[in-house]
Amino acid sequence: MKIGACFNYKNLHLLKERGFDFWEANLGWLAGISDEEFEKVREVCDRYDLYPYSANGFFTADMKLYEMTERRLQEYCTLAFSRLTQLGHNRMRGRICVVGGGGNRMIPPGFSRVRAEEIFVNSLRVCAEVGLKYDVTLAIEPLNSKETNFVNTLSEALKVCKKADHPHVMCLVDFYHFYCENEPLDVIKEAGELLAHVHLSAPDRYIPSAKDMDVCRKWKKALENIGYKGCVSLEGYWLPDEVTALENFRPVMQIYH
């Protein structure tokens, strides 16, 4: 499996020095920066030959899912996907954009849950149609019930994914949220070929270290059992600092890499 990390582009040298294969960007940030800063990002990526295979932060903070028009979604995705795929366009094909955004998809009080699901499914289809043009696949991220009230488990994400019924709409498993919701590993088997991406952290949301070897081996085995060929991104608390967290991750990296 290829290993990446949700990381600040200014520190990509730290990933490159440790054998990482890619970095995971923030899509909303990437879409919102100036052309000048985007060129700086491109220069750093080229310097270290490390590019964003994936992006999280699909929606910006001001984008409320149940208030957006299809045109707004199309325009946003066109800009965001265009920028993402310009980075390393000659080096990699087929990017992943993680659809998390607990606040963006939070169902407002009194709002119909059935209607919320209809809007979410349609929004996924609209974004995925833009994704077709850029070879970008959406990965629905379940978020634990303390962070949102909609799509908390991988089982729920799979249900939504199947309703969207689009080749560029798939699912992600984030093992922190998976752990929080006490989902059984058998759900990974249920996901099968619909699993497009993985976020990895320890059960306490820190970057995994030697103390997490046993649980990380179990998660890796579950992925192997379905023939998972996708990538894995580190996403968690980089404490006490990025360098120390990366060094502590080395033994776990050997499990997945």
List the model feature ranges, each with a label.
Residues 9-11, 27-29, 57-61, 103-105, ...:
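Active-site-proximal loop/turn and secondary-structure-junction residues that shape catalytic pockets
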Residues 19-22, 59-62, 104-108, 137-140, ...:
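A short alpha-helix capping/helix-coil boundary motif
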Residues 35-38, 65-67, 109-111, 151-153, ...:
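Short secondary-structure transition/capping segments
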Residues 37-48, 120-131, 187-190, 218-223:
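Catalytic-core regions built around general acid/base machinery
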Residues 47, 66-170:
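Active-site acidic/histidine proton-transfer and metal-coordination neighborhood
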